[in-house]
């Protein structure tokens, strides 16, 4: 939603593009013997925070989140082009313990060129990473006569993150990424790491969403309207 796009005229989808939804049967299959315990934790968290809203400057925020950072979160403006004062780059060192912290993907040179619409030089120079964002992700990559943003490269190659490096080996290009997701807002593995250190949920949201306040729905009684 923060990117401003729609899918099949819907504002929200049940995929990683917005928010994954899984039925209880799917969760039972995924969690196995841990299903009851995990579900209890979720229900308890929902119950204890019922009616609470994250706000900035008196208005509910767009609380974006993702799986795993590269050690820092990303500025919303650097990834989506839309600036949100509470979605700023912050340290997130706990993510290094995530099984999704690093990964590799291999492409043929032909597939790589086709997906990006570029040419790879014969000397093995795949492309020149020109700039990094504050969140240490790729901002721009220069190819022969063409420049792509890190976000564009990530989406065209279906990479886990826009923090990437690459090398050519023969007719293959190996891409190494750090992190998993767009990187904006709260890292789920980072939040879990903070919780494991004894931090409260109020500490966690204050770290990832700068300058926010927690309000209750009672504060907005009579102020919220359903959009028809």
Descriptions of predicted regions:
Residues 144-228:
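C-terminal soluble interaction/assembly domains
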Residues 1-172:
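Extended substrate/cofactor- or partner-recognition/assembly subdomains adjacent to catalytic sites
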